[in-house]
Amino acid sequence: MLPTLNAPVGGESNYTNKIAPVGMHLARIYQIIDLGTTEQTGQFGGKKRKVQILFELPLETAIFDPEKGEQPFYARNMYTLSMHEKSTLRKDVHSIEGKTLTEDEAKKYNVFSLIGRECMVNIIHKQSGDKTFANIQTITPLPKGMVCPPAVNPPLVFSTQQPDMVVFRTLPEFVQDKIKLSDEFIAYMNAEMSANYPANKPTPTPIPTFTIENDVKPSDFDWMQGDQEDPTKLPF
């Protein structure tokens, strides 16, 4: 059963040695990663909740790892989790769904329901310093009658509010590091800690102490003086 990821109604690029080619491509959504709410930098900084969506391009393949053979290229979009009428996420959801959502539909929309959905993506290349990025410029519905080849990559979703730690450990380390800083993931981990170590947990009974007196006086050993073979001189 899919977890729920609703975006409120109201207001990036990947670099590898081989990047997805320019042009319009058949695509399938195969990863939706909720990165949680973190502090953002830049002109529009502040705390924002982000979600990363990865698109598999089944007709565009290359050898990235000789041991795995040919694999499809992928493209990635990073969204602010918002279904405001002017948000990029809502615009792309409309494109994939092939219809305009009502305000009520947008408010209840489960972003994770996009997993496995097919569409067309238009990719452009953008230069930044000495690196070239493959960016998704537009997303459009799959044309009627067009069939998308079977998926190559397994579908994967991750929620910071209902985290599956098995899935979490499969994510790239830099993605894990982002998630660990999110408000939602921190709150979840704190709740888990409280459940395992409740505040009202009984305090263990302290171990009693045994103090050895060091201020021994010579008179304490008076009974040891004299003939110890005579039992009448023992203190008992």
Located regions from the model:
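Short beta-rich binding modules
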Residues: 1-236
